């Protein structure tokens, strides 16, 4: 029963934070530290597995759009082919950096102190970018210039540091490069598909010994909760940022990071 409750809580945290610019990894690490949830080899793998629930939410929400791209890709449509190439270009930097420095980053930087500091710094950056008087030139996430896709992919590599936020890094980069807020957020969703599936495949292979059929029920609970939560959050998030920007999420990061530092300093 306790494991099922853990799965529900972690599924909610994952589903709520995965596509918001607040760092799902950071929130999951802090949840494990301060509430004693998700600690241990199995739970490390569990957190990666339930990310697929969040990815499924994106596939469901954007099914029609992605299906058109898939059909266009095989029928020779230039725009569809260009978009797929763009996503692959944006995805490749994370593959390269992950293979070269992934083990070092995980062993040296995956701790709550780093998370809290990066939450605060990332919040300040997000607040700064949101206040800039940018003049967007790109309004369709499927039609960014190819070089723009590359720079977004390079920026996404910063999110390997826990607390930075994959979506936050890609959204900030896209906005600075000329995308409007909605297009920037949508491309971060699309880029998440290969990035998170790749991370899942690598982590699952590496930790496959930790996963048994005994864990199937717990993983299913986390997967379903993550899927439903992400489905609700993504719909709400896009409408909200289009109207109000990212100030709320910036301050959320700063507050959570500050409270985390205070708690750590007090010995929690």
Language-model regions: role of each:
Residues 1-268:
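Multi-pass membrane proteins that catalyze or facilitate reactions on polyprenyl-/lipid-phosphate substrates
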